[in-house]
Regions:
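Noncatalytic, basic helical substrate-engagement surface that gates or grips nucleic-acid strands
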Residues: 3-8, 19-156, 160-164
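A short, compositionally biased domain-edge/stem linker segment
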Residues: 8-14
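Short, surface-exposed basic-aromatic patches at helix termini and helix-loop junctions that form
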Residues: 165-169
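Conserved small/polar residues in nucleotide/adenosyl-binding loops
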Residues: 171-173
Length: 173
C-alpha cells in the first residue's frame, strides 16, 4: 500500500555515523523482506528460496537480523524493531490482491522448477516470500537474546514508529 509523502515530508539523507548514540526505529517487516528476497539460493540449479538449515527451515531472516543488528550495535546505534500487528480492515483488498499475486507466482515457480528453468524459478521465488508468524517469533526471540528491544504495533508498524518518534525521541527509519 504505502503513501507518497515526499511533497509534505521530503526524505533526508543521513549517515549511519550520525546515528551513533541514538535510538532508531526500524520497520521489522520491511527489513525481514529485504533478507528473505536477497539471501536466497541462487546457485545454478537453485530454487531461489531463502537460505535454509539442515531441516529445511528458512534462516535468511535470522542471519540478516543477526548481522545487521550486530553492525548497528557496533556503530553505537540503538535499534528498536517495530513489527506490524493486525492489518487494518481498510487494507483488506490490498492484502487479498497480494495473496492472489503470491499464489500466481507460486504456480509459475513450481512450473519453472519442473521445466528446469531455474532463472525463472529464482525470479518467481522473490515474489512468493512470506514472513510467517513462526519466523516473526524466531526473530523476536533472537532480538531478545541480543538484548535489543522490539514492539508489536496494534496495526501498521510505520504508524507505531511515527508515534514513538514523536513521543520518545526515537528516530524512525
Amino acid at each position: 500500500m504505502g503513501c507518497n509523502l515526499k511533497d509534505i515530508a521530503p526524505a533526508q539523507q543521513t549517515s549511519l555515523k550520525a546515528l551513533a548514540g541514538k535510538r532508531v526505529g526500524i520497520d521489522a517487516f520491511l527489513t525481514a523482506f529485504q533478507f528473505l528476497t536477497t539471501m536466497r539460493d541462487r546457485s545454478p540449479q537453485g530454487d531461489g528460496m531463502p537460505l535454509r538449515d539442515a531441516n529445511g527451515n528458512p534462516v535468511s531472516h535470522l542471519m540478516g537480523f543477526l548481522h545487521r543488528t550486530a553492525t548497528l550495535l557496533a556503530m553505537g546505534i540503538k535499534p528498536v524493531y517495530v513489527f506490524d500487528g493486525t492489518s487494518p480492515e481498510l487494507k483488506a483488498d490490498e492484502m487479498a490482491a497480494r495473496r492472489a499475486r503470491r499464489l500466481e507466482a507460486e504456480a509459475v515457480h513450481k512450473e519453472a522448477l519442473a521445466a528446469g528453468d531455474f532463472a525463472l524459478a529464482q525470479k518467481m521465488a522473490a515474489r512468493i516470500m512470506h514472513y510467517s508468524p513462526q519466523m516473526v517469533k524466531e526473530t523476536q526471540q533472537l532480538l531478545d537474546l541480543m538484548g535489543v528491544p522490539w514492539v508489536t504495533a496494534a496495526a501498521e508498524g510505520e504508524a507505531q514508529a511515527a508515534v514513538m518518534a514523536a513521543k520518545l525521541s526515537l528516530i524512525h527509519i
